[in-house]
């Protein structure tokens, strides 16, 4: 599993790609100050879902890292209008998949990390 510091870095890089240009610099600085929230969910399945997940998720999400048959790390949009970046890690074994998501949130929690997991599970049909 990736560490929170790496998740924070990946979130900030994704936010910068989603909001390019000099005019967005104040927004990027403010985003960097937000807290990272984490959510995790383990789901039982029959057989290793890696290939199905890779095919279904990489059409819509950005692959940041992968290890065949066991690990995917994706960048996705979550929250209202998919405007808040989330980083989701999927770890596969013979009979389950564990999804761990990180997202930044302000004073009012929007449960963006949980929403990212829910979206991934829907794409996987779980």
Regions found by a protein language model. Give the residues of each.
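Ser/Thr-rich, low-complexity intrinsically disordered terminal regions
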Residues: 1-126
């Amino acid at each position: 599993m990736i560490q929170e510091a790496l998740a924070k870095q990946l979130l900030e890089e994704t936010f910068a790609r989603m909001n390019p240009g000099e005019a967005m610099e104040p927004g990027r600085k403010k985003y960097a100050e937000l807290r990272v929230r984490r959510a995790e969910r383990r789901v039982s399945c029959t057989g290793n879902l890696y290939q199905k997940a890779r095919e279904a998720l990489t059409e819509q999400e950005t692959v940041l890292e992968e290890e065949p048959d066991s690990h995917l790390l994706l960048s996705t949009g979550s929250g209202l209008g998919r405007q808040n970046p989330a980083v989701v890690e999927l770890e596969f074994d013979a009979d389950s998949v564990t999804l761990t998501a990180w997202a930044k949130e302000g004073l009012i929690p929007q449960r963006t990390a949980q929403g990212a997991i829910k979206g991934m599970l829907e794409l996987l049909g779980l």
